[in-house]
C-alpha cells in the first residue's frame, strides 16, 4: 500500500477531530485502527465511529455491531473503496459507509438494505444526518475539508 498522501492525512485528521468534538461522549472515534469483520479480515478505515466500550477494546477490535459508521478517504484506492470495500462492509452489516473522493472533493454515502448498500448518495455540499444520529446535521464541507 502506498504511503498516505498529505491531503489524505490532513482531511481525515481534521474530520476525526471535528467528529470527536461534535459527538463527544456518545461515541469513540478511532482513526486508522483495525476493525474485526466476520470474514476474518481486519481493515483499518480512516475513521471508525464506534460504541464506547472502554477496556473491552483491549480484548478485541470493534465488531460490525459496535460500529455506527465508517469513513474512508480515497485517492488512488477510490475504485476499490467504492466497489469491493462497500460490498464487504454491507455484507458484514456495517450500518453506513462514507467515502470521500479526494480528487473531486465529494462525499459518497452508502446505506444498507438487506445486506447490500441500496442507497448511494453523492454530496458536494449541504448537510448529512448519520443514520445512527438523526438528530445531528454534519456539514459535508467538514468531512471533505474543501
Model-predicted regions and their roles:
Residues 1-146:
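Gly/Pro/Ser/Thr-rich low-complexity, intrinsically disordered segments predominantly at protein N-termini
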Amino acid at each position: 500500500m502506498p504511503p498516505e498522501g498529505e491531503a489524505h492525512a490532513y482531511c481525515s485528521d481534521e474530520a476525526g477531530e471535528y467528529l470527536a468534538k461534535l459527538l463527544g461522549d456518545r461515541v469513540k472515534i478511532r482513526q486508522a485502527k483495525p476493525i474485526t469483520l466476520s470474514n476474518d479480515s481486519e481493515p483499518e478505515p480512516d475513521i471508525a465511529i464506534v460504541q464506547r466500550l472502554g477496556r473491552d477494546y483491549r480484548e478485541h477490535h470493534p465488531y460490525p455491531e459496535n460500529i455506527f459508521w465508517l469513513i474512508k478517504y480515497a485517492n488512488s484506492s477510490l475504485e476499490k473503496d467504492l466497489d469491493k470495500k462497500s460490498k464487504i462492509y454491507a455484507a458484514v452489516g456495517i450500518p453506513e459507509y462514507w467515502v470521500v473522493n479526494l480528487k473531486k472533493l465529494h462525499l459518497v454515502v452508502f446505506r444498507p438494505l438487506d445486506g447490500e448498500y441500496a442507497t448511494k448518495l453523492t454530496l458536494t455540499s449541504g448537510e448529512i444526518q448519520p443514520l445512527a444520529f438523526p438528530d445531528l446535521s454534519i456539514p459535508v464541507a467538514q468531512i471533505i475539508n474543501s
